């Protein structure tokens, strides 16, 4: 299978930017174990990275239509800041509209996926790998779906999002 990333990594500058965008969120010596105690830090670091690389700009992947079956029609829910308002099925329906295409949204999903995977410790990867069918779409890595699985598996114990996340 040909990597989606090849097309936009033709120059050294683009490769450097790509590797910066997909760096682990945590410092290398402190990876994310998918534990509740690390979750707020994980989400804060993800929020910073997502803003930095434009994932939360209008028309980008983190802004999920309330009805993902009708893409690009609002109102929109910010997946990174309001993750508890979306089910995995809504996220998957949204990501299916662009995953595997040769465009920025598909590339950003792949970038998010790689950054998240590089952030997980061995323990975190072991918890997440069993749900591979939930974060892969037609053989493609789906960044938002992976994020939703990570959130669910982190067993959040804060705020009112607990019941929503556990049910989804």
Residue positions per predicted region:
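Extended alpha-helical scaffold segments
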Residues: 1-12, 49, 114-115, 120, ...
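Hotspots on structured nucleic-acid-binding interfaces, especially in canonical RNA/DNA-binding domains
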Residues: 7-108
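Short, well-ordered secondary-structure elements
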Residues: 61-165
């Amino acid at each position: 299978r040909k990597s989606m990333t090849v097309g936009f990594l033709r120059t050294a500058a683009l490769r450097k930017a790509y590797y910066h965008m997909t760096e682990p969120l945590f410092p290398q010596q402190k990876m994310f174990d998918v534990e509740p105690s690390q979750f707020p830090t994980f989400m804060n670091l993800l929020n910073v990275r997502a803003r930095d690389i434009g994932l939360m700009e209008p028309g980008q992947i983190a802004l999920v239509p309330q009805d993902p079956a009708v893409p690009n029609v609002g109102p929109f829910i910010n997946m990174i800041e309001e993750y508890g308002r979306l089910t995995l099925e809504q996220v998957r329906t949204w990501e299916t509209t662009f995953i595997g295409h040769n465009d920025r949204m598909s590339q950003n999903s792949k970038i998010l996926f790689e950054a998240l995977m590089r952030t997980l410790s061995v323990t975190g990867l072991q918890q997440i790998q069993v749900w591979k069918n939930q974060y892969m779409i037609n053989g493609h890595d789906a960044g938002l779906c992976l994020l939703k699985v990570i959130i669910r598996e982190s067993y959040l114990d804060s705020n009112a999002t607990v019941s929503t996340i556990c049910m989804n």
